Amino acid sequence: MNIPATGKDFMIVNMGPHHPSMHGVLRLIVTLDGEDVIDCEPILGYLHRGMEKIAENRTIIQYLPYVTRWDYLATMFTEAITVNGPEQLGNIQVPKRASYIRVIMLELSRIASHLLWLGPFMADIGAQTPFFYIFRERELVYDLFEAATGMRMMHNYFRIGGIAADLPHGWIDKCLDFCDYFLTGVAEYQKLITRNPIFLERVEGVGIIGGEEAINWGLSGPMLRASGIEWDLRKVDHYECYDEFDWEVQWQKEGDSLARYLVRISEMTESIKIIQQALEGIPGGPYENLEIRCFDRKKDPEWNDFDYRFISKKPSPTFELPKQELYVRVEAPKGELGIFLIGDQSGFPWRWKIRPPGFINLQILPQLVKRMKLADIMTILGSIDIIMGEVDR
């Protein structure tokens, strides 16, 4: 006998941390009245690794391999912000060629991140076919990364004052070929997805956020731009050499899950435009500021010196962070990724506060899912785009 659920007879359900749609180790405690969501409480911290404290016990160069583990699907952005802070504190000039290569890598990383958001998002909604097409394109981006950096993920490619290595011979032509191919791929996704009536039914009008509400919650990235706010740090902060390229900020005014999807799809085509312009106009010259190598360098050990046997153990070149405070930020695929850095006249930062976009964007989830159906939780959570590595840090 089925007893209808009344207002007093709520059901409490645990979603996660092993649920296939939870995008990592996220747990939601959901209170249900039948199919309607009454309340939702996210439980975080399953992937906490003490990243801020580790930073305070490492030099910047030693810490660089760690930062790729925050948002492990868009690692170029975490590397960029880690080197941008010391560069600003130390007034270190980045060569033009290195800046162009950084922009190319950042935009490729943005495309890879958006693709890896789109595939599982479609699978959560019930569309399996686009998932395989999307991963085919993402594989090509990872091939480009592997050719340039040696790694498909966790690239460890950015350095203070430049990058680790120049682009290999033939890489630029290969990347231009990918850009032409990918534009046809995006058109294919839009044919498959954007006007699909079942897809529209699942996302249109679901999880609406108004512009003022988005600002009050501190949202950033596609979450903010989908609510009618034209705010992109690449235009606002003028970092790297984005001002030298012709591109537009992508935004929508509806504020629902469909608008967030459209913003990300449009951003991928804008990223291709930026990459094509950067590849065609890439200047010659050095790919790193060679003066950085001379920081804090002890005299070279001599043949008969006791220290000579430890030559392979010599510390990495580093420099003292001046006694200053600095907040530095970049426009990551998920929003504003920032670091509040306090130097203390030593090689280690005194404080290293990470502002992860996913953590702040996730805070609005309980408000968005209230009074919605249980099945809408997947759509709304998927449209926020979170990675638990950077949420829990």
UniProtKB/Swiss-Prot annotation:
User: Which terms are listed as keywords in the entry?
Assistant: Chloroplast, Membrane, NAD, NADP, Plastid, Plastoquinone, Quinone, Thylakoid, Translocase, Transport
Q: Which reaction does it catalyse?
A: a plastoquinone + NADH + (n+1) H(+)(in) = a plastoquinol + NAD(+) + n H(+)(out); a plastoquinone + NADPH + (n+1) H(+)(in) = a plastoquinol + NADP(+) + n H(+)(out)
Q: Which domain of life is it from?
A: Eukaryota
* InterPro entries per the UniProt record, alphabetical: NADH_Q_OxRdtase_suD, NADH_UbQ_OxRdtase_49kDa_CS, NDH1_su_D/H, NiFe-Hase_large
Identify the EC number(s): 7.1.1.-
- Molecular function in Gene Ontology: NAD binding; oxidoreductase activity, acting on NAD(P)H, quinone or similar compound as acceptor; quinone binding
Entry keyword Transferase: no
Please name the top-level EC class of this enzyme. translocase
PROSITE patterns, A to Z: COMPLEX1_49K (PS00535)
Q: What is its main location?
A: plastid
Q: What's one GO-annotated cellular component?
A: chloroplast thylakoid membrane
Topology relative to the membrane, per the entry? Peripheral membrane protein
Alphabetically, which GO biological process terms does the record hold?
photosynthesis, light reaction
Q: Where in the cell is it found?
A: Plastid, Chloroplast thylakoid membrane
UniProt signal peptide: none
Task: Describe its function.
Answer: NDH shuttles electrons from NAD(P)H:plastoquinone, via FMN and iron-sulfur (Fe-S) centers, to quinones in the photosynthetic chain and possibly in a chloroplast respiratory chain. The immediate electron acceptor for the enzyme in this species is believed to be plastoquinone. Couples the redox reaction to proton translocation, and thus conserves the redox energy in a proton gradient.
Q: Indicate the family of this protein.
A: Belongs to the complex I 49 kDa subunit family.
Q: How does it assemble?
A: NDH is composed of at least 16 different subunits, 5 of which are encoded in the nucleus.
| Protein name (record) | NAD(P)H-quinone oxidoreductase subunit H, chloroplastic
Which species is the source of this protein? Carica papaya
Q: What does the record give as the organism's lineage?
A: Eukaryota, Viridiplantae, Streptophyta, Embryophyta, Tracheophyta
